[in-house]
Amino acid sequence: MAIEVPSLLITDDDSAFRETLQGVFEPQGYHTLLAGDGEEALHIVRTQVVHLALLDMHMPRLTGLQTLRLLKQVKAMLPCILMSANLDEAIIQQAQREHAFSVLRKPVTRLQITCVVRQALERAYNWHAGPARS
């Protein structure tokens, strides 16, 4: 499945963090969709084209892991990247069992998150972009 403009779903209950990531990815040519919690993310994946989901671990209503599990039921091949300031080995192992593409510790750098997103898109869709901007 070839894609021209990847659509990224950024899911975090912190609106400033969502907007920061939007400001990282949109100037690089990505289309971004924003969700404040897991239920909103599920609605977006069911109704819009989404190529990758970035998920905060700690959100109201559904955790990032719960959201990941439900997203995979809707769209099994959707690459999902889990992010958290509070990571432990149990969370990382659970994310791997749920087929998360990657687990990132917040705060993440612009270069780090851009590289992981590109790797996920390359693996899932054979999509290639120019060099990452830091």
Model-derived features: positions:
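Two-component/phosphorelay signaling modules centered on CheY-like receiver
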Residues: S15-L33, E98
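Acidic catalytic/metal-coordinating carboxylates
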Residues: D37-E40, T63-Q66
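Active-site beta3 strand of CheY-like receiver
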Residues: Q48-L54
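Receiver (REC) domain active-site loop signature in two-component systems and cognate sites
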Residues: M59
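As written
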Residues: G64, A95-F101
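C-terminal output helix
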Residues: A90, V108-V117
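CheY-like receiver
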Residues: A124-S134
